[in-house]
Amino acid sequence: MNKGKLFVISAPSGAGKTTILGRVMANVGRLNFSISHTTRTARPGEQDGVDYHFVEQEDFIEMQEKGIFLESAYVHKNYYGTSREAVMAQLSEGVDVVLDIDVQGATILMESASLPATYIFIAPPDLSVLEERLRKRGSDSEETIKLRMGNAAGEMLSSRKYDYLIVNDDLAQASTLLKSIIWAERAKSRRTPAGLPIKLVVE
């Protein structure tokens, strides 16, 4: 069985990544979302085990020390990590996996080179648009918004390390671009847009 492909997607907070991923995940088959662990508080509407695995900091650090995470990072005063076992199990079954992780976590994966992946960065048109989106979201304090904006400039520069850059100035277009990238990468690994292996007849 062909192994699945890993898609690593990063963006500054407020760039629209979650909305874009929601649209794409609903329309692309054989594509699973890897649910990260985090120590941050759940936002309104978020569900444990669906959006994130919400854990206490001491539990996260214990998991970190046991080597449970494929990557982990401390971002915006909270810990985030990706379960190694969960990702590898899905890839071994031929299912493509999406990792929604920050630039720190993505850089760890890039530098380790332990797992082939396609890296995609989603950016806002500019930082003023990003700040406007963060304020409209209404879930962050003024201190948190300033922290996220302070980190955003550096995150945008890191987009140069990624294989693809999507600028989200139009939600529908950005969603279509992400879907097209996934289909193109599947074709490179001899899969149909639906993610199924292509059977070639050799005479």
Curated annotation (Swiss-Prot):
Task: Report residues binding ATP.
Answer: 11-18
* Location in the cell: Cytoplasm
Q: Give the protein name, as stated in the record.
A: Guanylate kinase
The protein's enzyme class: transferase
- Tell me the name of the encoding gene: gmk
Q: Write out the catalysed reaction.
A: GMP + ATP = GDP + ADP
Q: Sorted alphabetically, which HAMAP family does this protein's record hold?
A: Guanylate_kinase
Q: What is its EC number?
A: 2.7.4.8
